[in-house]
Amino acid sequence: MRVRYTRDWGWSDSSQPYEVADFELSKYFSLGSTDKFRQRVIAADFWTADALSWDESSIQDGQKVYHRPPGYLGANLGGLFRMRAYPTSRFNDQAVVYYSLEYRLIPEWNPFADIDWIKKHLDIEWWQLTAFAELGRVSPDWNISDMHTSMKWDAGLGLRVLAKGMVARIDIAGCPEGYGVSMMVGQPFMF
């Protein structure tokens, strides 16, 4: 669980102060092992955020400047971590709600274990197959009923490997607007 408050005070070279509050909860449910899979897990994630200063503004050099956070800190969906079928920050507004569910399987069989070059240079300890679905919505204000209407969704498959102590992943996801492929180091949930 993470509760975070981020504020830019507008000091130094900052052109606009902003405030963002967000909450994220990730939970993992072990389904145990089988003859073919050494680990089976259902991973769930919930995230919500509100750009508290979204409607505030000031006049700078004769221009009205809104106190909104940069895209990577605000209430946005799309990209490497949330709503992976959509482009980065495809949806951006004052508030957001997001849900994700992943089914993760680590097979007993490791095809990389017997390849000397891979074993020596990459040391792939395990590989993982995933199936996932995501649901989310941005909104002009943090209103629980508004944020749960006309929600966007996507679903996809992923392949992850633990190489040299780091998780590398490739995910492909589809949505009503098309599909997206993402490659990244680390699992999609922040914790």
Predicted features along the sequence, with ranges:
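Transmembrane beta-strand segments that form the barrel wall of outer-membrane beta-barrel proteins
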Residues: 1-10, 83-88, 131-136, 166-176
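C-terminal outer-membrane beta-barrel translocator/porin domains of Gram-negative envelope proteins
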Residues: 1-122
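Solvent-exposed loop/turn segments connecting transmembrane beta-strands
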Residues: 8-17, 89-96, 149-152, 170-185
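Outer-membrane beta-barrel transmembrane domain signature
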Residues: 55, 102-110, 116, 120-155
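Internal helix-turn-beta structural module
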Residues: 151, 155-164, 173
